[in-house]
Amino acid sequence: MARQKKMGQSVLRAVFFLVLGLLGHSHGGFPNTISIGGLFMRNTVQEHSAFRFAVQLYNTNQNTTEKPFHLNYHVDHLDSSNSFSVTNAFCSQFSRGVYAIFGFYDQMSMNTLTSFCGALHTSFVTPSFPTDADVQFVIQMRPALKGAILSLLGHYKWEKFVYLYDTERGFSILQAIMEAAVQNNWQVTARSVGNIKDVQEFRRIIEEMDRRQEKRYLIDCEVERINTILEQVVILGKHSRGYHYMLANLGFTDILLERVMHGGANITGFQIVNNENPMVQQFIQRWVRLDEREFPEAKNAPLKYTSALTHDAILVIAEAFRYLRRQRVDVSRRGSAGDCLANPAVPWSQGIDIERALKMVQVQGMTGNIQFDTYGRRTNYTIDVYEMKVSGSRKAGYWNEYERFVPFSDQQISNDSASSENRTIVVTTILESPYVMYKKNHEQLEGNERYEGYCVDLAYEIAKHVRIKYKLSIVGDGKYGARDPETKIWNGMVGELVYGRADIAVAPLTITLVREEVIDFSKPFMSLGISIMIKKPQKSKPGVFSFLDPLAYEIWMCIVFAYIGVSVVLFLVSRFSPYEWHLEDNNEEPRDPQSPPDPPNEFGIFNSLWFSLGAFMQQGCDISPRSLSGRIVGGVWWFFTLIIISSYTANLAAFLTVERMVSPIESAEDLAKQTEIAYGTLDSGSTKEFFRRSKIAVYEKMWSYMKSAEPSVFTKTTADGVARVRKSKGKFAFLLESTMNEYIEQRKPCDTMKVGGNLDSKGYGVATPKGSALRNAVNLAVLKLNEQGLLDKLKNKWWYDKGECGSGGGDSKDKTSALSLSNVAGVFYILVGGLGLAMMVALIEFCYKSRAESKRMKLTKNTQNFKPAPATNTQNYATYREGYNVYGTESVKI
């Protein structure tokens, strides 16, 4: 019974093959079923699904104009690391009598597969990386990227960059880049990353390149490896503005770019699949409806470009056999397919016809125009070039063999600008008086109405000119923006722009070189410089003799010597000039009848001193020079005193009515030379960066002190720095922008002041992300506001109109006020001293006179004992003359 059953099965099998053979040779020897092979490696699950689905689409959508043939497939999975597995898989396909093989290869399996194909004349259609080797029977579905990469390197003018390549695919491109580098004098650092298994090694490579100040990377790897590298880029914070990554891969939309996009780095890539192609859209519509149990990674995973190449490979195979069928080429296999390991190898006779037909195919697929050269390489194809911006990816142009790279016009940029009108722009800023402050009733308000200040008004005016909607966002860390020297990550408002969390920064943000490298600035809306803030010193009490301050000590000494000199000269010329002498009156009785009278002279030494003093005090006296020489002396002395007194009076008003404050510091040089007063800056900002980078000796000395000072002289916020100045009792100076310094001087308690000039010159600018479409519009708005004078009006409004220290009170070290007793106390002291001296001299004169009179009376009494007493009038006259001679008052006439 079993034998009969077995014989029945053998008969049925024989009948089946007989019918199949008759059907297979019904059209001039062309089979009705074309068997193709499939070789798939690991990580090609979706490609395997796309392969089977493409065959299914062809078999269910036949061209009715020709007698249809069906595609049949045989699939083997190979382990590329095992050469025996590769050989066994290929021989399995060859022994089945397949007409062509579709499959993948890598660097290890490529030589084995291409050798078998060449020896056995079996065509191998592959979407794997293209090779420059002139191999036969290999149809390369993937276009070469070498020309496109070189075109973009020239377009972006890269002269210094890093080339990270996969060992399996990068040698041909590496050779082309190195040849171009020699011709164009490029600096290229090439690193192979194909054999790296540890992700930490990627991180070490990126850190090493960053230490070399490398900002541009060309990454030539498969999608999975690119995703791994970009993940490390994000972790290290190297995806900020200023970095540019060119991804040498045809699946730009397959790469995970969401995290990198928000960092602000510029990313350029290539895309072979045009998602706007109706064929692509139709395929995807069917693709997403597939049962994922039958077609893994079809429904919930995006279509890879390698899957699209797989679909197109089936189109190419089908089109080639259509051509062979139309040409009535006999491609049928008769008998056994043979042994692939035979020595010598026995090639398939029809294999050359199939290879020729495959190379002659020209069809439109999901990857565009599909056409091959004589070596089976893609030709006459177009690759789209994409750029990743903060707002997303956009098509930047295209590349083909004839036109090379063709960038798109700025229409896309204008569209971005137009779209900004329809969305709310995020404006990052910082709480800093008077730029941005909370209103007193801010808790009852919402949105932008909660804030007030210079930058709030400026943002409103800019938005009005640019015609955008915006919302103010206070930066979370309260910092302006600096890059961490270790992690290289930007903080503050600059970080908000760099990492895509804000669109504009309207704040007192200084325009610096390091910031300009990662963000764009408008023209300055305010000019300023670094200045020194100290606590306002106590008003110096005027000295007792402050009335002497209008003239220097040297001038007073010269006046004293001039006074003495003029008096002596006047005395001498009066003695020498005969016109200063005159006879006594005839009515005057001579003192001694026996001696001739002496002609008197009014300008003795004491009278000369008295005359000079009276003229200097502008009071005059009873005597005046009579001679020409004496009058010349008096005239020049009067002229001298006129100028001196006028100058003194003019300065006296200012010195007595102005309270002066003595500042211990007047400049940065004063700070650098001393050690008693500490000084510092904001911990994160352009002021600190200025001192860190400065090459001026004074500033280098100051930076050396600041970075090593204990406790730290750096403050987290400006308010902390101001508070430290106020509490330090004059022992701390704060270095900050001059505009902020001037503003704080105008605020109560009015105890700070700006000293010295500005240390540098710079400006505040409105910042936008690198390459932002808003940059030009914002820049024009700032220029227009400046020309209209609105920027000056805003500064006056928030600095001086709302000042709390009086007009100019915080701006000047000198303050005019009413005179106090201390200002003129010295004058009263001199008055009291003069009165006291006069009383004392009078007392001395009285005592002296009394004593002299007593002696005279005794002498007279003794004389009377020897002589008769003289007449009374004669005695009185003699007494008077004696008294006169005692005092020597020659100017009195008797």
Curated annotation (Swiss-Prot):
Disulfide bonds join 91-340, 750-805. GO terms for cellular component: AMPA glutamate receptor complex; dendritic spine; endocytic vesicle membrane; parallel fiber to Purkinje cell synapse; plasma membrane; postsynaptic density membrane; postsynaptic membrane. Residues 603-618, 619-621 dip into the membrane without crossing it. It is found in: Cell membrane; Postsynaptic cell membrane; Postsynaptic density membrane. Residues 574-602, 622-627, 845-894 are cytoplasmic. Keywords: Cell membrane, Disease variant, Disulfide bond, Glycoprotein, Intellectual disability, Ion channel, Ion transport, Ligand-gated ion channel, Lipoprotein, Membrane, Palmitate, Phosphoprotein, Postsynaptic cell membrane, Receptor, Signal, Synapse, Transmembrane, Transmembrane helix, Transport. Residues 1-28 form the signal peptide. One of its GO terms (biological process) is long-term synaptic potentiation. It comes from the Eukaryota. Glycans are attached at residues 63, 266, 380, 415, 422. Pfam families: ANF_receptor, Lig_chan, Lig_chan-Glu_bd. Residues 29-552, 649-823 are extracellular. L-glutamate binds at residues 508, 510, 515, 686-687, 737. The modification Phosphotyrosine is found at residues 877, 887. A lipid is attached at residues 621, 847 (S-palmitoyl cysteine). GO terms for molecular function: AMPA glutamate receptor activity; amyloid-beta binding; glutamate-gated calcium ion channel activity; glutamate-gated receptor activity; ligand-gated monoatomic ion channel activity involved in regulation of presynaptic membrane potential; transmitter-gated monoatomic ion channel activity involved in regulation of postsynaptic membrane potential. InterPro entries: ANF_lig-bd_rcpt, Glu/Gly-bd, Iono_Glu_rcpt_met, Ionotropic_Glu_rcpt, Iontro_rcpt_C, Peripla_BP_I. SMART domains: Lig_chan-Glu_bd (SM00918), PBPe (SM00079). It is a multi-pass membrane protein. It catalyses: Ca(2+)(in) = Ca(2+)(out). The chain crosses the membrane at residues 553-573, 628-648, 824-844. It is linked to Intellectual developmental disorder, X-linked, syndromic, Wu type: A disorder characterized by significantly below average general intellectual functioning associated with impairments in adaptive behavior and manifested during the developmental period. MRXSW patients have moderate intellectual disability, and additional variable features such as macrocephaly, seizures, myoclonic jerks, autistic behavior, asthenic body habitus, distal muscle weakness and hyporeflexia. Ionotropic glutamate receptor that functions as a ligand-gated cation channel, gated by L-glutamate and glutamatergic agonists such as alpha-amino-3-hydroxy-5-methyl-4-isoxazolepropionic acid (AMPA), quisqualic acid, and kainic acid. L-glutamate acts as an excitatory neurotransmitter at many synapses in the central nervous system and plays an important role in fast excitatory synaptic transmission by inducing long-term potentiation. Homotetramer or heterotetramer of pore-forming glutamate receptor subunits. Tetramers may be formed by the dimerization of dimers. Interacts with PICK1, GRIP1 and GRIP2. Found in a complex with GRIA1, GRIA2, GRIA4, CNIH2, CNIH3, CACNG2, CACNG3, CACNG4, CACNG5, CACNG7 and CACNG8. Interacts with CACNG5. Found in a complex with GRIA1, GRIA2, GRIA4, DLG4, CACNG8 and CNIH2. The postsynaptic actions of Glu are mediated by a variety of receptors that are named according to their selective agonists. This receptor binds AMPA (quisqualate) > glutamate > kainate. This is Glutamate receptor 3. It comes from Homo sapiens (Human). The lineage of its organism: Eukaryota, Metazoa, Chordata, Craniata, Vertebrata. The gene is GRIA3.
